[in-house]
């Protein structure tokens, strides 16, 4: 039986094959993307492709630059042709929960800009509904994080935790906290997102709704492609 890393590796080649010369490419964040970036660099240099990368996190930018991928600031490009990223959950409508790596705001900016957004995932990420197995990350301002948490908990039997890293609060690339929200039952993601995004101090939620074009899934039986239904 293949482990999670092996399943992720299976998805990478299909994603790299979608790269074309002269693209502005959105490069995501997380363990799957860290497997993708070296393969991406290999193809760019082997075929001498002109690729401009915009990265969803400082970590991804560091890795890409180290492999001599041309990386620029998001404000230096007018569009993104293709964005490739991972996901923490994928539901039956290929809506997502993202943000396990703490980069959800920048991920959403780039993924929404992209003409085409492709997600890489192993089969363990496929769920019946969002929040079934992974906590929903919400990026919040440090100033009033505790009060935001209480308002989130008041919504509908939700448990929040401020994300920690090495016994100190995790800080995003934007200088904010992450609240991880445990949903104890199925909740309408559109309704909950609207509630959250209007709370003062909330920067963004980990719901990625109606923006995914394709999911490449690594399974024990091979690669499965799920395309957005028209």
Swiss-Prot record:
Residues at the active site: 107
InterPro entries recorded: NagB/RpiA_transferase-like (IPR037171), Ribose5P_isomerase_typA_subgr (IPR020672), Ribose5P_isomerase_type_A (IPR004788)
Domain of life: Bacteria
Isomerase keyword on record: yes
Keyword Isomerase: yes
Pathway, per record: Carbohydrate degradation; pentose phosphate pathway; D-ribose 5-phosphate from D-ribulose 5-phosphate (non-oxidative stage): step 1/1
Any GO BP: D-ribose metabolic process
SUPFAM superfamilies: D-ribose-5-phosphate isomerase (RpiA), lid domain, NagB/RpiA/CoA transferase-like
CDD domains: RPI_A
Disulfides per UniProt: none
Molecular functions (GO terms): ribose-5-phosphate isomerase activity
Pfam families for this protein: Rib_5-P_isom_A (PF06026)
The entry's keywords: Isomerase
Protein EC: 5.3.1.6
GO cellular component annotations of the record: cytosol
Catalysed conversion reaction: aldehydo-D-ribose 5-phosphate = D-ribulose 5-phosphate
Residues at which substrate binds: 29-32, 85-88, 98-101, 125
Function of the protein: Catalyzes the reversible conversion of ribose-5-phosphate to ribulose 5-phosphate.
Family: Belongs to the ribose 5-phosphate isomerase family.
NCBIfam families in alphabetical order: PRK00702.1 (NF001924), PRK13978.1 (NF010585), rpiA (TIGR00021)
Quaternary context: Homodimer.
The protein's name in its UniProt record: Ribose-5-phosphate isomerase A
